[in-house]
Amino acid sequence: MQNRFLESITQLDKPLANALVPLLHDQFCGHIDASQFAGLVKASGKTEQQVLMDLLPIAAALANPPISEFYVGAIAKGSSGDLYMGANLELPGEALFHSVHAEQSAISHAWLSGETEIVDIIVNFSPCGHCRQFMNELVNGSKINIHLPNQETQTLAHYLPYAFGPSDLDVTVPLLCKREQEFNCDSDDPMIIEAIDQMGLSYAPYTNNNAAVVLETNDGATFCGRYAESAAFNPSMQPMQMALSNLIRNNRQYSEIKRAVLVESSVGKITLVGAAMDALHAIAPIELQHMVVEPLLG
Protein backbone atom coordinates (compact mmCIF):
# COMPACT_ATOMS: atom_id res chain seq x y z
CA MET A 1 0.00 0.00 0.00
CA GLN A 2 1.21 3.50 -0.82
CA ASN A 3 2.42 5.50 2.18
CA ARG A 4 0.10 8.41 1.38
CA PHE A 5 -2.89 6.25 2.38
CA LEU A 6 -1.55 4.99 5.71
CA GLU A 7 -3.38 7.59 7.79
CA SER A 8 -6.63 7.71 5.83
CA ILE A 9 -7.08 3.93 5.82
CA THR A 10 -7.28 4.03 9.63
CA GLN A 11 -10.44 6.15 9.35
CA LEU A 12 -12.34 3.29 7.69
CA ASP A 13 -14.23 0.45 9.35
CA LYS A 14 -12.14 -2.71 9.37
CA PRO A 15 -14.20 -4.73 6.81
CA LEU A 16 -13.99 -1.92 4.24
CA ALA A 17 -10.33 -1.22 5.00
CA ASN A 18 -9.41 -4.89 4.58
CA ALA A 19 -11.18 -5.03 1.21
CA LEU A 20 -9.66 -1.75 0.03
CA VAL A 21 -6.00 -2.30 0.95
CA PRO A 22 -5.27 -4.67 -1.98
CA LEU A 23 -6.44 -1.96 -4.39
CA LEU A 24 -4.04 0.64 -2.98
CA HIS A 25 -1.01 -0.83 -4.74
CA ASP A 26 1.85 1.18 -6.23
CA GLN A 27 -0.05 1.88 -9.47
CA PHE A 28 -3.26 3.02 -7.79
CA CYS A 29 -4.20 6.53 -8.95
CA GLY A 30 -7.73 6.83 -7.62
CA HIS A 31 -9.64 4.70 -10.15
CA ILE A 32 -11.98 2.01 -8.83
CA ASP A 33 -13.94 0.16 -11.48
CA ALA A 34 -17.60 -0.78 -11.09
CA SER A 35 -16.92 -4.41 -10.17
CA GLN A 36 -14.30 -3.42 -7.59
CA PHE A 37 -16.73 -0.92 -6.10
CA ALA A 38 -19.44 -3.58 -5.89
CA GLY A 39 -16.95 -5.78 -4.03
CA LEU A 40 -16.20 -3.00 -1.55
CA VAL A 41 -19.90 -2.43 -0.92
CA LYS A 42 -20.47 -6.13 -0.33
CA ALA A 43 -17.49 -6.47 1.99
CA SER A 44 -18.47 -3.42 4.02
CA GLY A 45 -22.08 -4.43 4.59
CA LYS A 46 -23.04 -0.81 3.95
CA THR A 47 -25.00 1.01 1.25
CA GLU A 48 -23.29 2.40 -1.85
CA GLN A 49 -23.88 5.92 -0.54
CA GLN A 50 -22.20 5.11 2.77
CA VAL A 51 -19.18 3.53 1.07
CA LEU A 52 -18.76 6.51 -1.25
CA MET A 53 -18.65 8.79 1.76
CA ASP A 54 -16.23 6.47 3.55
CA LEU A 55 -13.87 6.60 0.56
CA LEU A 56 -13.47 10.39 0.69
CA PRO A 57 -10.43 10.31 3.05
CA ILE A 58 -8.69 8.12 0.47
CA ALA A 59 -9.44 10.69 -2.24
CA ALA A 60 -8.25 13.53 0.00
CA ALA A 61 -4.93 11.73 0.45
CA LEU A 62 -4.24 12.47 -3.23
CA ALA A 63 -4.17 16.22 -2.52
CA ASN A 64 -1.10 18.45 -2.77
CA PRO A 65 -2.00 21.80 -1.14
CA PRO A 66 1.25 23.46 0.03
CA ILE A 67 -0.41 26.88 0.40
CA SER A 68 -3.70 26.19 2.19
CA GLU A 69 -2.73 22.83 3.74
CA PHE A 70 -6.45 22.11 3.32
CA TYR A 71 -7.04 18.64 1.90
CA VAL A 72 -10.14 18.19 -0.25
CA GLY A 73 -11.07 14.92 -1.91
CA ALA A 74 -13.75 14.29 -4.51
CA ILE A 75 -15.09 11.27 -6.35
CA ALA A 76 -16.74 11.41 -9.76
CA LYS A 77 -18.95 8.43 -10.57
CA GLY A 78 -19.36 7.85 -14.28
CA SER A 79 -22.35 6.40 -16.10
CA SER A 80 -20.19 3.26 -16.44
CA GLY A 81 -20.31 2.83 -12.66
CA ASP A 82 -16.58 3.44 -12.31
CA LEU A 83 -15.24 5.80 -9.63
CA TYR A 84 -12.61 8.46 -10.32
CA MET A 85 -10.96 10.18 -7.38
CA GLY A 86 -9.49 13.64 -7.47
CA ALA A 87 -8.04 16.13 -5.01
CA ASN A 88 -6.98 19.75 -4.81
CA LEU A 89 -3.60 20.86 -6.12
CA GLU A 90 -1.79 24.13 -5.42
CA LEU A 91 1.47 25.31 -6.96
CA PRO A 92 4.05 26.52 -4.43
CA GLY A 93 4.61 30.26 -4.52
CA GLU A 94 2.27 30.80 -7.46
CA ALA A 95 -0.95 32.80 -7.78
CA LEU A 96 -4.06 31.03 -6.53
CA PHE A 97 -5.64 30.91 -9.99
CA HIS A 98 -3.17 28.14 -10.84
CA SER A 99 -4.92 25.86 -8.33
CA VAL A 100 -6.89 22.77 -9.30
CA HIS A 101 -10.03 22.08 -7.28
CA ALA A 102 -10.84 18.54 -6.16
CA GLU A 103 -13.97 18.32 -8.29
CA GLN A 104 -12.03 19.46 -11.36
CA SER A 105 -9.37 16.86 -10.65
CA ALA A 106 -11.93 14.06 -10.35
CA ILE A 107 -13.81 15.15 -13.48
CA SER A 108 -10.61 15.44 -15.50
CA HIS A 109 -9.60 11.97 -14.26
CA ALA A 110 -12.88 10.59 -15.60
CA TRP A 111 -12.56 12.51 -18.88
CA LEU A 112 -9.00 11.34 -19.53
CA SER A 113 -10.20 7.79 -18.84
CA GLY A 114 -12.89 7.98 -21.52
CA GLU A 115 -16.04 8.60 -19.47
CA THR A 116 -18.77 10.42 -21.40
CA GLU A 117 -21.07 11.33 -18.51
CA ILE A 118 -20.73 11.98 -14.78
CA VAL A 119 -23.81 11.04 -12.77
CA ASP A 120 -22.59 11.64 -9.21
CA ILE A 121 -20.05 13.88 -7.49
CA ILE A 122 -19.09 12.99 -3.93
CA VAL A 123 -17.04 15.56 -2.04
CA ASN A 124 -16.07 16.16 1.58
CA PHE A 125 -16.82 19.92 1.51
CA SER A 126 -19.53 21.86 -0.31
CA PRO A 127 -18.47 22.70 -3.89
CA CYS A 128 -17.41 26.31 -4.33
CA GLY A 129 -19.01 28.49 -7.00
CA HIS A 130 -16.03 27.89 -9.30
CA CYS A 131 -16.61 24.13 -9.24
CA ARG A 132 -20.37 24.41 -9.57
CA GLN A 133 -19.84 26.43 -12.73
CA PHE A 134 -17.27 23.95 -14.06
CA MET A 135 -19.65 21.03 -13.46
CA ASN A 136 -22.37 22.91 -15.32
CA GLU A 137 -20.27 22.58 -18.48
CA LEU A 138 -20.65 18.78 -18.48
CA VAL A 139 -23.10 16.54 -20.31
CA ASN A 140 -26.38 16.81 -18.36
CA GLY A 141 -24.48 18.88 -15.82
CA SER A 142 -27.55 20.26 -14.07
CA LYS A 143 -28.69 16.70 -13.30
CA ILE A 144 -25.48 15.56 -11.60
CA ASN A 145 -26.18 14.38 -8.05
CA ILE A 146 -24.05 16.13 -5.43
CA HIS A 147 -23.36 14.06 -2.31
CA LEU A 148 -22.04 15.79 0.83
CA PRO A 149 -21.48 14.45 4.36
CA ASN A 150 -24.54 14.80 6.59
CA GLN A 151 -26.59 16.50 3.88
CA GLU A 152 -29.41 15.39 1.62
CA THR A 153 -28.32 14.55 -1.92
CA GLN A 154 -29.27 17.31 -4.36
CA THR A 155 -28.70 17.91 -8.06
CA LEU A 156 -26.33 20.57 -9.31
CA ALA A 157 -29.39 22.63 -10.31
CA HIS A 158 -30.12 23.00 -6.59
CA TYR A 159 -26.63 24.35 -5.92
CA LEU A 160 -26.51 26.48 -9.07
CA PRO A 161 -30.00 27.88 -9.75
CA TYR A 162 -30.65 30.11 -12.76
CA ALA A 163 -27.36 28.86 -14.17
CA PHE A 164 -25.39 30.34 -17.05
CA GLY A 165 -23.94 27.62 -19.23
CA PRO A 166 -22.91 26.41 -22.67
CA SER A 167 -26.37 26.74 -24.19
CA ASP A 168 -26.34 30.48 -23.44
CA LEU A 169 -23.37 30.77 -25.80
CA ASP A 170 -24.94 28.47 -28.40
CA VAL A 171 -22.71 25.51 -27.55
CA THR A 172 -24.68 22.31 -28.13
CA VAL A 173 -21.91 19.73 -27.59
CA PRO A 174 -20.84 20.07 -23.94
CA LEU A 175 -17.77 18.81 -22.12
CA LEU A 176 -17.41 14.98 -22.00
CA CYS A 177 -19.21 14.47 -25.31
CA LYS A 178 -17.32 12.25 -27.72
CA ARG A 179 -15.62 14.60 -30.15
CA GLU A 180 -12.34 14.68 -31.97
CA GLN A 181 -10.71 17.35 -34.10
CA GLU A 182 -7.83 16.20 -36.27
CA PHE A 183 -4.66 18.24 -36.56
CA ASN A 184 -1.70 18.13 -38.89
CA CYS A 185 1.20 16.12 -37.50
CA ASP A 186 4.48 15.89 -39.38
CA SER A 187 6.49 14.59 -36.41
CA ASP A 188 7.57 11.04 -35.62
CA ASP A 189 8.27 11.97 -31.98
CA PRO A 190 5.96 9.75 -29.85
CA MET A 191 5.49 12.49 -27.27
CA ILE A 192 4.47 15.04 -29.90
CA ILE A 193 2.11 12.53 -31.48
CA GLU A 194 0.51 11.84 -28.08
CA ALA A 195 0.14 15.57 -27.41
CA ILE A 196 -1.57 16.17 -30.76
CA ASP A 197 -3.89 13.20 -30.19
CA GLN A 198 -4.88 14.60 -26.79
CA MET A 199 -5.25 18.07 -28.28
CA GLY A 200 -7.84 16.67 -30.69
CA LEU A 201 -9.90 15.54 -27.70
CA SER A 202 -9.72 18.87 -25.86
CA TYR A 203 -12.71 21.17 -25.36
CA ALA A 204 -12.36 24.77 -26.52
CA PRO A 205 -15.66 25.94 -28.04
CA TYR A 206 -15.23 29.57 -26.94
CA THR A 207 -11.71 30.28 -28.22
CA ASN A 208 -11.11 27.44 -30.71
CA ASN A 209 -7.75 27.02 -29.00
CA ASN A 210 -7.65 23.25 -28.74
CA ALA A 211 -4.60 22.43 -26.66
CA ALA A 212 -2.89 19.70 -24.65
CA VAL A 213 0.17 19.16 -22.49
CA VAL A 214 2.23 16.01 -22.11
CA LEU A 215 4.79 15.59 -19.34
CA GLU A 216 7.50 12.93 -19.54
CA THR A 217 9.25 11.57 -16.46
CA ASN A 218 12.75 10.15 -16.12
CA ASP A 219 11.54 6.59 -16.63
CA GLY A 220 9.75 7.44 -19.89
CA ALA A 221 6.20 7.52 -18.48
CA THR A 222 3.92 10.25 -19.83
CA PHE A 223 1.11 12.20 -18.19
CA CYS A 224 -1.26 14.28 -20.28
CA GLY A 225 -3.68 17.11 -19.72
CA ARG A 226 -6.24 18.65 -22.08
CA TYR A 227 -7.67 22.14 -22.20
CA ALA A 228 -11.25 22.27 -20.88
CA GLU A 229 -13.09 25.57 -21.24
CA SER A 230 -16.03 26.90 -19.26
CA ALA A 231 -18.79 29.20 -20.48
CA ALA A 232 -17.87 31.42 -17.52
CA PHE A 233 -14.24 31.52 -18.81
CA ASN A 234 -12.43 31.78 -15.43
CA PRO A 235 -13.28 28.21 -14.28
CA SER A 236 -11.67 26.80 -17.44
CA MET A 237 -9.08 24.12 -16.64
CA GLN A 238 -5.65 24.64 -18.13
CA PRO A 239 -3.92 21.67 -19.78
CA MET A 240 -0.74 22.12 -17.74
CA GLN A 241 -2.69 22.02 -14.48
CA MET A 242 -4.59 18.95 -15.65
CA ALA A 243 -1.33 17.22 -16.53
CA LEU A 244 0.22 18.12 -13.16
CA SER A 245 -2.88 16.87 -11.35
CA ASN A 246 -2.62 13.65 -13.36
CA LEU A 247 1.05 13.30 -12.42
CA ILE A 248 0.46 13.83 -8.68
CA ARG A 249 -2.58 11.55 -8.67
CA ASN A 250 -0.29 8.83 -10.04
CA ASN A 251 2.03 9.30 -7.05
CA ARG A 252 4.83 10.86 -9.06
CA GLN A 253 6.99 13.82 -8.06
CA TYR A 254 7.64 17.10 -9.87
CA SER A 255 11.36 16.35 -9.66
CA GLU A 256 10.81 13.38 -11.98
CA ILE A 257 9.70 15.56 -14.92
CA LYS A 258 12.34 15.71 -17.63
CA ARG A 259 10.33 17.06 -20.58
CA ALA A 260 7.15 19.06 -21.12
CA VAL A 261 5.30 19.76 -24.36
CA LEU A 262 2.39 22.12 -25.07
CA VAL A 263 0.62 21.94 -28.41
CA GLU A 264 -2.15 24.31 -29.42
CA SER A 265 -4.20 25.19 -32.46
CA SER A 266 -3.11 27.75 -35.03
CA VAL A 267 -6.70 29.05 -35.26
CA GLY A 268 -7.19 29.76 -31.55
CA LYS A 269 -8.12 33.24 -30.38
CA ILE A 270 -5.72 32.98 -27.43
CA THR A 271 -2.50 31.26 -26.41
CA LEU A 272 -1.86 29.26 -23.26
CA VAL A 273 1.93 29.30 -23.47
CA GLY A 274 2.44 32.00 -20.82
CA ALA A 275 0.16 30.34 -18.29
CA ALA A 276 1.70 26.93 -18.97
CA MET A 277 5.26 28.24 -18.57
CA ASP A 278 4.42 29.96 -15.28
CA ALA A 279 2.94 26.77 -13.85
CA LEU A 280 5.77 24.56 -15.09
CA HIS A 281 8.54 26.82 -13.87
CA ALA A 282 6.99 26.89 -10.40
CA ILE A 283 7.69 23.20 -9.96
CA ALA A 284 10.42 22.09 -12.39
CA PRO A 285 13.59 23.71 -13.81
CA ILE A 286 12.94 22.66 -17.40
CA GLU A 287 11.94 24.53 -20.53
CA LEU A 288 8.52 24.15 -22.11
CA GLN A 289 8.49 22.86 -25.68
CA HIS A 290 5.73 24.75 -27.51
CA MET A 291 4.18 23.84 -30.85
CA VAL A 292 1.37 25.41 -32.85
CA VAL A 293 -0.32 23.08 -35.34
CA GLU A 294 -2.97 23.50 -38.00
CA PRO A 295 -6.33 21.72 -37.95
CA LEU A 296 -7.16 19.38 -40.79
CA LEU A 297 -10.20 20.60 -42.67
CA GLY A 298 -12.96 18.44 -44.01
Swiss-Prot record:
Give UniProt keywords alphabetically.
Hydrolase, Metal-binding, Zinc
**Cofactor remark:** Binds 1 zinc ion.
Q: Pinpoint the CMP/dCMP-type deaminase domain residues.
A: 47-167, 186-298
Q: Which Pfam families match?
A: dCMP_cyt_deam_1 (PF00383), dCMP_cyt_deam_2 (PF08211)
Q: Which GO terms describe its molecular function?
A: cytidine deaminase activity; identical protein binding; zinc ion binding
**Residue positions binding substrate:** N88, L89, E90
- The EC code for this enzyme is 3.5.4.5
Name the Gene Ontology biological process terms.
cytidine deamination
Q: Where is the active site?
A: E103
Give the reaction(s) catalysed. cytidine + H2O + H(+) = uridine + NH4(+); 2'-deoxycytidine + H2O + H(+) = 2'-deoxyuridine + NH4(+)
**Is Cell membrane given among the entry's keywords?**
no
Q: What class of enzyme is it?
A: hydrolase
InterPro entries (alphabetical) = APOBEC/CMP_deaminase_Zn-bd, CMP_dCMP_dom, Cyd/dCyd_deaminase_Zn-bd, Cyt/Deoxycyt_deaminase, Cytidine_deaminase-like, Cytidine_deaminase_bacteria
Question: What's a single GO CC term here?
Answer: cytosol
- Determine if Metal-binding is one of this entry's keywords: yes
Cofactor(s) recorded for this entry are:
Zn(2+)
Binding residue positions for Zn(2+): H101, C128, C131
Q: Which family does it belong to?
A: Belongs to the cytidine and deoxycytidylate deaminase family.
Q: What does this protein do?
A: This enzyme scavenges exogenous and endogenous cytidine and 2'-deoxycytidine for UMP synthesis.
Q: How does it assemble?
A: Homodimer.
Q: What is the protein name for this chain?
A: Cytidine deaminase
Taxonomic source organism: Shewanella frigidimarina (strain NCIMB 400)
Q: Which gene name does the record give? A: cdd
